[in-house]
Amino acid sequence: MANNNIMGIDFGTHFACVGIFKNERIEICPNQQGNRTTPSVVSFVGDDKLVGDEAKAQMDRNPLNTIYDVKRLLGRKTTDELFDHEVKKLSFKVTTYEDNNEKIEFQVNYKSNVVTLTPIEIATSILEQIKHTAETFIGGESIKKAVISVPTDFTEKQRNDLKEAATAAGITVVRMIHEHSAVALAYGYDQVKECSETTNESKESNVMVFDLGGSGVSASMIRVRSKLFEMIGNVSDHTVSGEHFDHVLVQHFTQEFNRKYRCDLTDNARSKAKLKSACEKAKRNLSNMTQAALEIDSLYDGRDFFTNITRARFEDMASGLIKGSINAVSQLLEKCNMTKEQVDKVLLVGGASRIPSVQNQLLNFFDNRQDILERSMNQEEVVAHGTTIQATILAADKSNQSLTCNSSNISMGAPFSAKFTPVTIGIQDSNGNLIPIIPSSSLIPCKRTFTLNTSSENQDNLNMAVYQGSAPLAKDNQLVSRFIFKSSPNPIDVTFEIDNNNTLLIKSEQANYSIKF
């Protein structure tokens, strides 16, 4: 297949990852240091701007001029509910625009000057580095297009800011897909292939994506049947994340150090950054070992800090976070009106999903069904793998070719559809709000059924206005069409379905409509 140079990018909170179709298979591109993920970090040192691994190395020694976690602040305003909470955890200076105190800027020392930079500019630097990584991997050939994954709860503003950053980095975003859709695609592609080769029957399964990553915990339910992927619900909670597990360790060791040396290291940005980095490493080690050591030279005022912690102690301190992460699972089941027995597989995503107690609690929740947790996927790479599959399919579409997949590679063959809805499709409620029916980045084909009720007695007709967009108020979105139903003493069930031809089918007992997008 001709290389149409569409890469798949996972722009993560802590790390970014990029994949490309090469040698008849999906490949995750290693960076200059040989690592398959690149830290989402930018550091300014004298006259140099460092990105990725080199920048992350500066977090301990140059914390005031090293920007990280930019994904959390992309598309945000200072008036957002979580802004103050997020900023308190950062070591660098966050300011606001002179002419707009709701807009966020970062202040650093660069080339002997005080420089202000926006979240978009920092994201641009990271995406430029990712683009360079992919281009180097394929021998220096230019790559100008990408599929980029976004969280399920990313707002339209956040999407637009990420797209603007990509454009500034020389990347055309041909599609944005939900991170969980990418995970399902990475997992389900082989399942679909296996099913289609072994039987003509339509095998249906309910797959839950459990994502405990740097920015929060989220869970999605995706129904898989033959070549149909249908996202039927998702929940997210930003009060529980891998970062919060790190913070548990940071608090614990800060108190231990302060007790031991009778001082307060929290007034020193460099000391806090060094401790945070060591705690991140300890958390990762505790997923594989029952005890982890911290060895930090000259942590504060020339004092070394050598200590350790057991996995049992860590999991006890983090028990509230672990319980909170499992709550997302029960909330998702309630939202989808499903029982835990109806879930066939749980896909684990995000570094913190490796914590043994998290996995044990998930197993307990699902009555110790040993085969329910899918542990074979690489949690750090699976989203990029899924976005790259989507990118490869789009490249094949442009070449009038199709794709199939086996356990090791992707090649031309029988067709497989993996398109996604570009925008949310919803209806207006009686208060003028948009009620999403089919979320953006839902895998196509997909369908949803909902109920219309009369809002008052003696109502002759039911009016339904259909919009596309993600703005909370319906009027701020694009009107698709208006429909009128005759009032009925019983609720009216309406089904929205988007087929492989991007046609919206609206079905009810009274009438059927079709709208081509």
UniProtKB/Swiss-Prot annotation:
Q: Which GO terms describe its biological process?
A: chaperone cofactor-dependent protein refolding; protein refolding
Q: Which cellular component appears as one GO term in the record?
A: phagocytic vesicle
Query: Which keywords annotate this record?
Result: ATP-binding, Chaperone, Nucleotide-binding
Pfam families for this protein: HSP70
Record GO terms (molecular function): ATP binding; ATP hydrolysis activity; ATP-dependent protein folding chaperone; heat shock protein binding; protein folding chaperone
Q: Is Chaperone among this UniProt entry's keywords?
A: yes
Among InterPro entries, the record links this protein to: ATPase_NBD (IPR043129), HSP70_peptide-bd_sf (IPR029047), Hsp_70_fam (IPR013126)
Q: Which family does it belong to?
A: Belongs to the heat shock protein 70 family.
Q: What does this protein do?
A: May function in protein folding and assembly, and disassembly of protein complexes.
Record protein name field: Heat shock 70-related protein 5
Q: Which organism is it from?
A: Dictyostelium discoideum
